[in-house]
From Swiss-Prot:
The lineage of its organism: Bacteria, Pseudomonadati, Pseudomonadota, Gammaproteobacteria, Vibrionales. The active site is at residue 287. Its EC number is 2.7.-.-. Keywords: ATP-binding, Cell inner membrane, Cell membrane, Kinase, Membrane, Nucleotide-binding, Transferase, Transmembrane, Transmembrane helix, Ubiquinone biosynthesis. One of its GO terms (molecular function) is ATP binding. Pathway: Cofactor biosynthesis; ubiquinone biosynthesis [regulation]. This is Probable protein kinase UbiB.
Length: 544
């Protein structure tokens, strides 16, 4: 390790000990190393003993900086790994850090654009509108049209910091996996690898721009969701230019109510938008926390969601969508047998899973949920309980389902914050039933025919020629098969002849050896010559 890496590692361990995070290790697995480090090397005590462990973990991650804050945010969605009191504290982590110098931001923007800002913009505000761990946002106007826009620029020199911390994370994950057998189930190395991929994706603003363009296209003209327009000609890997929007933050309940917003419709539309993204588009915004969601104030009776920051998105293939919809419908119909069978059929759990045991486990975990009124059941926690139970039966971590679960928890939490009486199931069930009908009913056949019709129309003129070629190739194949079979029969016949000649030759050689000391020397010589001759003939038969 380099001196810089050792210094950073020292700081990380120091912060962990100051916040008493060694308590996260099971007592029977607590080795002498943390105790020795605390007492003899650092002389550090837990300075926050009055705070609950989850609170201490959150404060420690905040002190360690942006890379660790975002790691904690990701871990808050993995409620299969942490108890609720820790996951709830991690969910409170805010990706807000002190802004960096606006002149540095301007320098990097001009570098990305290849020229001075005033070639494209006017009224550039050197003071940032918002600042986060990865990027910072400034406002300006387009020079040609006067349209208000925002410029999002990656923090300067952030990549070396991220690379250094990720390297340390990987080393620490390997140490934890090796030294703590109980931690291997949590797959710390795989968790860090998943986080690294997500974080590095956020460093390329071209990816976020492409996601925003796709999401905007999916909801073009929609009254339910608006996505600000990206200006791709001015965007690059380190700079994204997009339309500026004015809205009310979705968590600002007081302002929304003062504006006369229809809170019930707003909450229900959040659910509709989510399921539309998942099941209609197979492409969903996977970072729908309150900081990324605003409400259009212009028409409060018909409120419209505004989605920002499309850096993290999720996708589902058609099989996953179908199994997910069937799972949810079966669960709310309390058909646990079907839920278990669907998990096996989808490959989410191994095919040799005992379905009876799996059904019983699901029933034991999920049946108590129905003790509550249907409107109070948490859709997100339904998925959480299902996936946690499935993991006991060796369900592999499905990244796309983890993102889906996280997003559903966000949407459900926002919806019930806006309208506590929100019955998410009543809103979602008709959508799921209609979608399933379109997938497996007569309409599904019609849709499939419509989808494939252009392809078959293109291939129709070629069908006679393709049919003729197939028949000709089939005839040639039959002739070739006859030749191969005849060759096989000839080969077997030659092998049989060779074996016979070899046996006769061997017999004659043995007779020659027996007769060599007898009065019949000439007969012995004749047998020997004949035996060698038969051997040569058998060798020739094998060679053919």
């Amino acid at each position: 390790m380099t001196p810089a890496e050792l210094k950073r590692l020292y700081h990380i361990i120091k912060v962990q000990l100051e916040y008493g995070l060694d308590e996260l290790m099971p007592e029977h697995q607590l080795t002498k190393a943390p105790l020795l480090a605390r007492k003899s090397l650092f002389w550090l005590k837990n300075k926050h003993q009055d705070k609950e462990l989850g609170h201490r973990l959150r404060l420690a991650l905040q002190e360690l900086g942006p890379v660790w804050i975002k790691f904690g945010q990701m871990m808050s969605t993995r409620r299969d790994l942490f108890p609720p009191h820790i996951a709830d504290q991690l969910a409170l982590l805010q990706d807000q850090v002190a802004p960096f110098d606006g002149q540095l931001a301007k320098r990097d923007m001009e570098k990305a654009l290849g020229g001075r800002l005033d070639n494209w913009f006017t009224d550039f505000d050197i003071e940032p509108l918002a600042s986060a761990s990865i990027a910072q946002v400034h406002t300006a106007k387009l020079k040609e049209s006067g349209r208000e826009i925002v410029l999002k620029v990656i923090r300067p020199d952030i990549r070396p910091v991220i690379d250094a911390d990720l390297k340390l994370m990987h080393r620490m994950a390997r140490i934890v996996a090796k030294s703590l057998p109980e931690a291997r189930r949590l797959k710390p190395v795989e968790v860090v690898h998943e986080y690294e991929k997500t974080l590095l994706d956020e460093l390329d603003l071209r990816r976020e721009a492409a996601n925003a363009i796709q999401l905007r296209r999916n909801f073009e003209g929609s009254e339910e969701l608006y996505v600000p327009e990206v200006i791709p000609d001015l965007s690059s890997e380190t700079l994204m230019v997009s339309e500026r929007i004015y809205g009310i933050q979705v968590s600002d309940i007081e302002t929304l109510e003062a504006n006369g917003t229809n809170m019930k419709l707003l909450a229900e539309r959040g659910v509709t938008v989510f399921f539309t993204q998942v099941f209609r588009d197979s492409f969903f915004h996977a970072d729908m926390h309150p900081g990324n969601v605003f409400v259009n104030p212009e028409n409060p009776d018909n409120p419209q969601w505004i989605g920002l920051d499309c850096g993290i998105v999720g996708t589902l293939n058609s099989e996953d969508k179908r199994y997910l919809a069937e799972n949810l419908l079966a669960f709310f119909n309390r058909d646990y047998r079907k839920v278990a069978e669907l998990h096996v059929d989808s490959g989410w759990v191994p095919h040799d899973t005992n379905v009876n045991d799996f059904e019983f486990a699901i029933r034991m975990v999920c049946e108590p949920i129905f003790a509550k009124p249907l409107g109070e059941i948490s859709f997100g926690h339904v998925l959480l309980n299902l996936f946690n139970t499935a993991r006991r039966f060796n369900m592999e971590v499905q990244p796309q389902l983890v993102l889906l679960q996280k997003t559903l928890l966000y949407v459900e939490g926002l919806g019930r914050q806006l309208y506590p009486q929100l019955d998410l199931w009543a809103t979602a069930k008709p959508f799921l039933e209609t979608w399933m009908m379109n997938q497996v009913g007569p309409q599904a056949v019609i849709n499939a025919v419509k989808e494939r019709a252009p392809f078959w129309a293109e291939k129709l003129p070629e069908l006679p020629e393709l049919l003729y070629d197939s028949l000709r190739q089939g005839k040639a194949m039959n002739h070739r098969m006859d030749q191969l079979y005849q060759g096989y029969r000839d080969s077997k016949r030659q092998q049989a002849t060779g074996k016979f000649l070899f046996g006769v030759g061997a017999t004659l050689v043995v007779c020659s050896a027996i007769l060599v000391s007898s009065p019949y020397e000439q007969l012995s010589m004749g047998c020997g010559i004949a035996g060698v001759t038969f051997w040569l003939l058998s060798w020739r038969a094998y060679r053919r």
